[in-house]
């Protein structure tokens, strides 16, 4: 039989063990995501927070002509500026999403959207981003931001978005 002292010691030991287990489960996890400085730069450059991350291009700043896959000079300068700004705050991983309007057949539009995304990736690598840190997607006409029934809407849909994912 256990004496009262032995029971107290055993109970105390059990409580200490349970407290240590609870504390081990409460260890803080290193912070993930973006720093306030990185978020400030993203906002300054015109990125908007979306369900998929911080996206640039929703307001139609990197647009393409109909059936065109190369960036014009103004869009090239925008992508260069963005790439340099991201690197200046140690954002090194992005996703580049190419888009088209709904004109033409979808298999062709997907290929065209990939080529558009590649043209942006090329500029980003020229300013110092590593190609292996850039995910590329060609989405064709699957994610329009405007109606394809008007010329203005189709113009808005011929675009590339740059997305920063905080992980």
Indicate residue ranges for each PLM-predicted region.
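Short, flexible coil/turn micro-motifs enriched in small/turn-prone residues
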Residues: 20, 48, 55, 93, ...
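Periplasmic OmpA-like peptidoglycan-binding domain that tethers envelope proteins to the cell wall
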Residues: 99-167
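Short, small-residue-rich loop/turn micro-motifs
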Residues: 58-62, 90, 98-100, 138-140
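Periplasmic peptidoglycan-binding/anchoring modules of Gram-negative envelope and division proteins
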Residues: 38-43, 48-49, 63-97, 125, ...
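N-terminal targeting leaders that direct proteins to extracytoplasmic destinations
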Residues: 1-53, 69-70, 77
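Envelope-exposed proteins and targeting segments
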Residues: 43, 52-54, 58-60, 67, ...
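Core alpha-helical elements of the protein kinase catalytic domain
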Residues: 24, 84, 121-122
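Extracytoplasmic/periplasmic, Sec-exported soluble proteins
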Residues: 30, 67-78, 88, 104, ...
């Amino acid at each position: 039989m256990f004496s009262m002292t032995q029971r107290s010691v055993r109970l105390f030991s059990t409580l200490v063990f349970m407290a240590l287990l609870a504390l081990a489960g409460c260890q803080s996890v290193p912070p993930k995501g973006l720093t306030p400085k990185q978020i400030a730069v993203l906002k300054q450059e015109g990125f908007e927070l979306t369900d998929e991350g911080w996206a640039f291009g929703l307001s139609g700043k990197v647009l393409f002509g109909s059936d065109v896959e190369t960036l014009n000079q103004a869009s090239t300068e925008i992508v260069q500026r963005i790439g340099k700004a991201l690197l200046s705050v140690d954002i090194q991983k992005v996703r580049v999403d190419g888009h088209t309007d709904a004109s033409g057949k979808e298999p062709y539009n997907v290929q065209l959207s990939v080529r558009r995304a590649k043209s942006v990736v090329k500029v980003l690598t020229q300013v110092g981003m590593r190609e292996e840190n850039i995910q590329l997607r060609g989405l064709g006409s699957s994610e329009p931001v405007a109606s394809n029934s008007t010329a203005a809407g189709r113009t808005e849909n011929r675009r590339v978005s740059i997305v920063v994912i905080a992980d």
